């Protein structure tokens, strides 16, 4: 059986690398687009540099994306920004809509069958401007007629690493009535390995059953033991990149760090 080729934007980031590892474990061929940076791509990717194809490209620069979509069945777009800085021109619209538009055009021009957008679930602790930009990005992909899947993901964390008490409480409330009945399961932070494995399995489905997926859908694509124990294939964040709770898609341009 032919291995499906999947392109991921955001190589060298917490989310991008977790998705790459999950897809490799499922038998896919993976290509990573790594944003130009002072740190060499090989160093940012670690062992993934030898297990994937990778190229340097900037999703905010359409010219750098030219030709990278060819030969791929699916493209997963992971990059955006949860923290805006309008003084530097880094609005929610620029960070999330412009990057999505550029990747969508790469997919159309390169013959990519389907684009998966890592979007965000609405939650009280998530900025409304960020959510609005994500929804506009979702609508743009649909508007241009590109087959797409939307992952409205919560915040993620690496198992075994400290998290603020607030986020631990939010994860616990996911299964406690009445919070479990009012959509909390969609918003509660989840382990990165569960999210990555769920997205990988959706990406490899020939005919996804729905257009928009939330955290409960991702959990259902993990076995009981995977949900309980996690998996060793997910690369743990380095000391330099580790955060108690991770923004789902932050990889802002111009060397800017939120």
What is the meaning of each model-derived region?
Residues 5-26:
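N-terminal Rossmann NAD(P)H-binding glycine-rich loop of SDR-like oxidoreductase domains
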Residues 125-227:
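Oxidoreductase cofactor-interface core, primarily capturing Rossmann-like NAD(P)-dependent enzymes
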